A protein has these predicted regions:
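Glycine-rich beta-alpha junction loops
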Residues: 59, 109-114, 154-160
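Conserved beta-ketoacyl condensing-enzyme motif
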Residues: 1-28, 149-164
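Long, repeat-rich segments with strong aromatic
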Residues: 131, 137-169
Length: 178
């Protein structure tokens, strides 16, 4: 089992796994945790180290606010650039087999850290744009594909502002239209 959550030490995931008595890896990479877990699980299954792997993710709005921004009890006004962390959870089973199914993980491209010096905790989307653009461009280059090969291109926590910047960044700097 590979799990991720938005709290330090993946404490929510670890508490949930206590009673299951199965191998467990906690993944801490914020909003990328779920997709990172899927890529790692697919690698484990593909290499024959596991027949199946469960990947789970959870988050809680107020816990994320307290850790990343400001405790909600402070009553800080949220600016329009602020993302809204969901309170929710989800899980998938990654499995190999003789016959590939209609949904497959065939490639994974891990991102690199980019730090352009943005410091606003309420505008993390803008701060993540360079890394998101770099990861997408490297993925397209590595796989020899273009954006038309995909039904959807999804990112983590860019929000409305960061998503708009990413679209413009890719179009203006690289001629890539998403």
């Amino acid at each position: 089992t590979l799990t991720t959550d938005l709290l330090n030490q993946c404490v929510s995931s670890s508490f949930a796994m206590r009673s299951l008595k199965v191998p467990h890896v906690g993944i801490f990479c914020a909003c990328a945790g779920f997709v990172c877990g899927m890529a790692l699980a697919a690698s484990l299954v593909d290499a024959g180290f596991a027949r199946r792997a469960v990947v789970g993710a959870s988050s809680h709005h107020d816990a994320a606010e307290r850790q990343y921004r400001f405790p909600t009890e402070l009553g800080v006004q949220r600016p329009p650039t602020a993302q809204w962390t969901v309170t929710g959870a989800g899980a998938v089973v990654i499995a190999g087999g003789e016959t590939p199914g209609p949904i497959q993980i065939t490639h994974a491209t891990f991102g690199r850290v980019w730090d352009l010096g943005l410091k606003d905790p309420y505008d993390m989307g803008s701060a993540m744009v360079p890394a998101a653009a770099d990861t997408l461009l490297r993925h397209l280059n590595d796989t020899g594909r273009n954006v038309d090969a995909y039904d959807w291109i999804l990112t983590g926590d860019l929000g409305r502002v960061g998503s708009r910047i990413l679209i413009d960044w890719l179009k203006d700097r690289h001629g890539v239209h998403i």
